[in-house]
Structure formats: C-alpha cells, structure tokens
C-alpha cells in the first residue's frame, strides 16, 4: 500500500495532481479542500494517500491531513458510497461540517453535494453516527482530538441539561485555544441570551 507521497508537484488540474517522487510521477485524485491548499507547481508537496485496487484500475487518492484521509476511509465503509462519492463529499464539505451534520443528523448539507441524494444522505447519517466523537463534532472516534477543551465544555453543557444542538452551537463559537472554565462561562453566557 502507498500511504504517503513526498515529492515535487508537477501538474495540478482539479481534481487530479501529479507528484514526481524521484523520477516517478504519481497521479492522485484529491478533494478540493486539499487542492486549494497545494503549493504552486514545481514546489515540494507531501500528501497522505489511500491506494485502491479495482478490477479495472489502480487508483491513488491524496489528502492534506490525516483527519481527511480517516474520514475518506470511513465514508468508503458506508454501503453504496464509493471512492468517487467519498471524494465528492470531502470536496463539498469540510470534515468539521460533515461531523456537524452527522452529530445533528441533518441531511440538508449532504444533499447539496453533487451525486448525493436524500436516501444516500440518510444512509450516511445512520452509518456514520457512531463514527464521530462528540467533541463539537470535529473528530473521528478513535482519533486523537485536538480540541479536548471543547469536548470538556460540551460535556459540561450536556450535564447541565442543555440539548446537544444548543451545546454544539455554543461550543462552535468558542476560540480554539480557550481554557475549559472560560469556555463554560462564555457558553453559558451565550446560551442565556437565547
């Protein structure tokens, strides 16, 4: 399996890129979120990859972050979602937006993605609901969430009796580097205004 590519970016034409790794050019399909963060052609680039072998093709998908690749892998496990659909979802939604939609069980964001209908969106929400940790809806279960303070604030709000939707909305407004006590204080102030 090819897990990572490091080399010179030779071509980039959405959604494909070519990376020269010591004289060998690897063609990768990337989500638009990764594509927009790529350097100019001729510069060094590192992509985390997922190698997929099919009967008629061998395909390489590249990602700018481990979280994005992990989400792609989870999407592939959903019945009826292939690599093309998973890439379209990650091109249309950030990982955070997808996690938020799953946490709140909202099909609205998913059906805006080309190729994702109402039934597929509902299946995605059903099959992914246990795959995302409740830390503001931003991390996959089993990954190491960087926002433990947000998770603690969210858990505190839930323990105080706020529903998940209100608590998630309040936590999403907090700065990323906030302390837990300050986060709870600001969230309670925000929730008391509604």
Swiss-Prot record:
Organism: Methylobacillus flagellatus (strain ATCC 51484 / DSM 6875 / VKM B-1610 / KT)
The keyword rRNA-binding is annotated on this UniProt entry: no
Name under which the protein is recorded: Holliday junction branch migration complex subunit RuvA
Main location: cytoplasm
UniProt free text on domains: Has three domains with a flexible linker between the domains II and III and assumes an 'L' shape. Domain III is highly mobile and contacts RuvB.
Region called Domain III, residue ranges: 145-194
Alphabetized InterPro entries for the sequence: DNA_helicase_Holl-junc_RuvA_I (IPR013849), Hlx-hairpin-Hlx_DNA-bd_motif (IPR003583), NA-bd_OB-fold (IPR012340), RuvA (IPR000085), RuvA_2-like (IPR010994), RuvA_C (IPR011114), RuvA_C_sf (IPR036267)
NCBIfam families, per database record: ruvA
């Amino acid at each position: 399996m090819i897990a990572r590519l490091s080399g010179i970016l030779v071509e980039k034409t959405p959604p494909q890129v070519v990376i020269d790794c010591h004289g060998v050019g690897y063609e990768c399909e990337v989500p638009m979120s990764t594509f927009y963060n790529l350097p100019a052609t001729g510069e060094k680039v590192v992509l985390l990859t997922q190698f997929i072998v099919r009967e008629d093709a061998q395909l390489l998908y590249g990602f700018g972050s481990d979280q994005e690749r992990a989400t792609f892998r989870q999407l592939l496990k959903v019945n009826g979602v292939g690599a093309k659909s998973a890439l379209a979802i990650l091109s249309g939604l950030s990982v955070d937006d997808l996690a938020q939609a799953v946490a709140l069980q909202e099909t609205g964001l998913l059906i805006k993605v080309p190729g994702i209908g109402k039934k597929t969106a509902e299946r995605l929400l059903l099959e992914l609901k246990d795959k995302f940790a409740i830390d503001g809806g931003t991390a996959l279960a089993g990954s190491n969430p960087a926002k433990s303070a947000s998770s603690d604030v969210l858990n505190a709000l839930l323990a105080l009796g706020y529903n998940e939707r209100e608590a998630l909305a309040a936590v999403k407004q907090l700065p990323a580097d906030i302390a837990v006590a300050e986060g709870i204080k600001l969230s309670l102030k925000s929730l008391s205004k509604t």
